[in-house]
C-alpha cells in the first residue's frame, strides 16, 4: 500500500483578493449603500454601508490632520464599540498601522506594547470594568496630567505624541475623539498604499515570554476574513452576531473583514461577553450567524432563559480557540439551529485561520479535528529533523502561504526563529493528518511529556478527562521524575472534590497506563494569559514548588 505523506495544499476556484481594506470598504459601500453595515446595540448605533464609509473618511481626515502619516502606528485600547470598527477601517484607508491592545492589559503590558512598536497616537476608552485607563496611562507617564498642549513629549513613551480619548477628555493634554471623527473629509491619494503594506500589529499571548508584535498586511487579513466567510457561504443577506473581542483576530479579521468583503451586517450585542445579551441580539436582530469560543456557546446554552429566545434564524457560525465537546456541538447544531457551524484553527501569525471544517463535515470531524486546509495555504507535519511524516503520525505543524505574517515588529531574530528560510511558519503545535486530509491538533510541541521514552500528548488526556461527569475543565502537563524523566500531572476544575485514586480508577482500562495522571490537584482556576490561554509553564512551576513544600 502506498504511504501518503502529511503535506496539504488548499485550492479554490475563487481567486485571492488583491486590494487594500480601504478599497474593499469603498466597493462594498458602493454595492450595498443602504444595506445595514454596523449595529452596536449597547450604543444605539445603526449605520448603513454608505454611512460607515463616510464616517471612516472623516476620521481618516482627522488622523491625517494631526500629522500622522502612512506607516505610523495608531493604538486602540478599548472594549468592543463602534469607534473600534471606525478606527480599524480609517487607519487602513490612509495606510496607517492599527495596533490592537488587549482591554485587560495592566500598566507593564501596556507600556511594553506601546514602546515595542513605537505607537505615535493612542485612542483609548476612559475606563472599562475595574480598569481606569487614563489613570493607568498617567502611572506610566505622569507628565500627561500637567501637559499644556495636545502634542505630548513623554520620557517613558518617547514615540507617543497624541492620546485621543473616547468620551469627554479628562485633562487638557488629551484629545477628543468625537471632534476628530467629525473632521471634514479630504482628498487622499490611496494609490501609494499597497495590499502588501502592513496594516495591523497583533500581540501574541506570551505564554512563554513577553508578547511579540505579529505584523499583518492588508493582503494577509482581508483574504483570511474573506475565505472564512466563503467557507460558510456568507453573503450580504447574512447578519453576524459578534460577541468575540475586536482586539483579537477573531473579531477584527474573521468577523469584521468577513462582513466587509461580503456586505454582511455586523452586530455587536455588548462591550464584553454577556450570554444574555447575545441571545437577545440574535432574536431581536434576526441573526443568521454567531461566532464564539466553545465556552461562550456553553454559557449561552446554560443561560436560565435560553428556551425563551427565538434562535430559529441562525444558520451558521464559527467556533475557534479550542475543540468543542461532542454534546455541546450537538446542542449548538440542534437547539441553536446552527447546522452549518464551522470549526476554525490558526494562530495570530497566520492572520489567523489555516484550517476550517466544511459545511458538509460530519459531527466527528467537527469535534475531533480542525478540518481541512484553507484555500491557497500549504501545510505539512514534520519530525524533529524537518522531514515530512506519513499521515497518521504526529509532528510539528508548519504553514506557508499568503496568510503568513510579515514578521514580529522590530524583532528580526524572533521572526527567523518562527519563519524558516523556505517561508514556513512553525506553529509549535503537534498535529497529525488523518487519511481523509482533516487535521487533528494533539498538543503543543513544548508541552509534550516524555515519560520513560514514551511521547505523551496532554491534549489527548485532556480530551479524555473532560468526559468525566464531575470535571468542568482540565489541564495536563509534565512534572519532573527521577526515574521516568517526567510524570503526568492533571489540574482540574471540578464540581466536587476528586482524589487521584478515583481519577486513576476512572482512567484504568480506558487509556494506556503510562498516560494515567500520577498527580492530581483540584483548583478553582488556572493561571491564564491576558488573552485567556492557560499558562502551563506557570502551573508546572507552581506544582513543583508545592510538591517540594509538601515533602518537607
Predicted features and spans:
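Structural core segment of the AMP-binding/adenylate-forming
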Residues: 66, 94-178, 495-496
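Conserved pre-ATP/AMP-binding loop-to-beta segment of ANL
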Residues: 33-36, 156-160, 165, 171, ...
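Conserved AMP-binding/adenylation subdomain of ANL enzymes
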Residues: 222-239, 249-289, 303
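Gly/Ser/Thr-rich phosphate-binding loop
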Residues: 264, 284-292, 301-365, 378, ...
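N-lobe entry segment of adenylate-forming
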Residues: 1-47, 51-66, 70, 115-118, ...
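Conserved AMP-binding A3 loop
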Residues: 46-50, 199-223
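AMP-binding/adenylate-forming catalytic core of the ANL superfamily
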Residues: 105-115, 122-126, 290, 385, ...
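Conserved AMP-binding/adenylate-forming core of the ANL superfamily
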Residues: 17, 26, 37-89, 106-111, ...
